C-alpha cells in the first residue's frame, strides 16, 4: 500500500537494500540499530516509553578501527523521518559513548521553514523557541542523548512525536545468528493462535 503524504511525495512502505557481499548492507542496519537503541534505551530503562516497545538488540557505537585517523574521530548519524505531518531531522555525534553534538529540527511536510527544537554542542545546549522555557533543564549526562532526556522528564509535543517514531522502529538483521533463533509474536491472541496453528501444520 502506498503511504499518501500530500502535499509532499507519496511513499512506499518498504525499502530494499541491494549490494554485493561486503558492500555495507549489514553495517547500515547496524548503524540504524545503534542510533535507535541509543535514543530509546534510556527511556525504556526509566519506564517512560509512550508505545508498546519491542526491545532491540543494543549495538555499540564503535568507530572504524583500521584507520588511525577515524579511530579517534566521532561517529556521526543523520536521520530524516516523517510523523504527524512533520519531517524531522535528527543529528547525533558520539565518541566513546559520549555525546559530542546533537540536534533536532522539524518542518511541516511540504513546507520550507525549518524550526530548531534544540541544538547541543558539548555541554552547551540551545533550545528552540517552541521549547525555550526556563523550567527545562539543560544539565544532562554526557552519555545520554538530550532527546532521551527531554522524553523522560517533560511532556513536549514535538519530542513526544520523535520519541514515538523511534520507539516504533523494528530492525531485524538476520546476519546476526542470535536473531535467527528468535521469533517475534503479536500480543493479539487471534493472530498468535493463527501463527502457532500455521507452524503446527508445517510439522
PLM feature spans:
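AAA+/P-loop NTPase substrate/partner-engagement loops
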Residues: 49-70
Amino acid at each position: 500500500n502506498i503511504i499518501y503524504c500530500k502535499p509532499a511525495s507519496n511513499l512506499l512502505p518498504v525499502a530494499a537494500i541491494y549490494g554485493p557481499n561486503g558492500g555495507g548492507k549489514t553495517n547500515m542496519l547496524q548503524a540504524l540499530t545503534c542510533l535507535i537503541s541509543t535514543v530509546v534505551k534510556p527511556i525504556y530503562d526509566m519506564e517512560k516509553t509512550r508505545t508498546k516497545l519491542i526491545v532491540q538488540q543494543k549495538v555499540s557505537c564503535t568507530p572504524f578501527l583500521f584507520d588511525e585517523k577515524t579511530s579517534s574521530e566521532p561517529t556521526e548519524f543523520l536521520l530524516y523521518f516523517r510523523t504527524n505531518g512533520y519531517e524531522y531531522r535528527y543529528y547525533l555525534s558520539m565518541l566513546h559513548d559520549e555525546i559530542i553534538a546533537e540536534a533536532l529540527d522539524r518542518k511541516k511536510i511540504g513546507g520550507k521553514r525549518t524550526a530548531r527544537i534544540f541544538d547541543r554542542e558539548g555541554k552547551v545546549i540551545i533550545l528552540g523557541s517552541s521549547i525555550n522555557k526556563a523550567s527545562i533543564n539543560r544539565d544532562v549526562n554526557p552519555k545520554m542523548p538530550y532527546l532521551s532526556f527531554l522524553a523522560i522528564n517533560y511532556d513536549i509535543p514535538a519530542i513526544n512525536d520523535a520519541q514515538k517514531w523511534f520507539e516504533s522502529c523494528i530492525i531485524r538483521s538476520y546476519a546476526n545468528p542470535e536473531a535467527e533463533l528468535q521469533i517475534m509474536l503479536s500480543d493479539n491472541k487471534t493472530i498468535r493462535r493463527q501463527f502457532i496453528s500455521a507452524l503446527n501444520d508445517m510439522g
